[in-house]
């Protein structure tokens, strides 16, 4: 496989390349992830840079990790599953709702043309923006705000990925999809959700596919939950 873009790397990133390979082969490929672009991007992006320093030794393990503000960086497999379900293409413009530490946006940015990502916690948004600059991932735009409202001035999008659990599919986000566009979101209660792929049909309707049960922190916003409890 060839890298699509060269990422800014530090020595510690190269030293942990073996851990990334093990993560990809043992956690992703063994569970059915097949998209070459997703696999290559997750081999490239230094996941450990997106977790707090005191947790970096666990960055490539099979599970989520706390990143502050009551939020988490998702399990590697779930990140791969959601991005693969988005069916990303090199020319795509993608919106992410729930930046967190920025890992999923970073993985997406190595695959698609441009990523717009919204985070409701300013501290996380600022941290992600700084990290993107450090890694020279210059095709990611970060905003602080209510992600359930989307990014109207940048719409429509080829894909939208929601990295928090919603009580229902946010209709505003569906309206910001291009015809043929895909939205991937966990939908359900505050404990368990069903991971859904919503595709906007050419006639304006929507087709929904279920991928399985997941657990995400709540999507808080006007078209989400009104609090986290």
Curated annotation (Swiss-Prot):
It is found in: Cytoplasm. One of its GO terms (cellular component) is cytoplasm. Gene3D superfamilies: Vaccinia Virus protein VP39. Its EC number is 2.1.1.77. Its main location: cytoplasm. It catalyses: [protein]-L-isoaspartate + S-adenosyl-L-methionine = [protein]-L-isoaspartate alpha-methyl ester + S-adenosyl-L-homocysteine. InterPro entries: PCMT, SAM-dependent_MTases_sf. One of its GO terms (molecular function) is protein-L-isoaspartate (D-aspartate) O-methyltransferase activity. Pfam families: PCMT. One of its GO terms (biological process) is protein repair. Keywords: Cytoplasm, Methyltransferase, S-adenosyl-L-methionine, Transferase. The active site is at 74. PROSITE patterns: PCMT. The keyword Cytoplasm applies. PANTHER family: PROTEIN-L-ISOASPARTATE O-METHYLTRANSFERASE, PROTEIN-L-ISOASPARTATE(D-ASPARTATE) O-METHYLTRANSFERASE. Belongs to the methyltransferase superfamily. L-isoaspartyl/D-aspartyl protein methyltransferase family. Catalyzes the methyl esterification of L-isoaspartyl residues in peptides and proteins that result from spontaneous decomposition of normal L-aspartyl and L-asparaginyl residues. It plays a role in the repair and/or degradation of damaged proteins. This is Protein-L-isoaspartate O-methyltransferase. It comes from Pelotomaculum thermopropionicum (strain DSM 13744 / JCM 10971 / SI). The lineage of its organism: Bacteria, Bacillati, Bacillota, Clostridia, Eubacteriales.
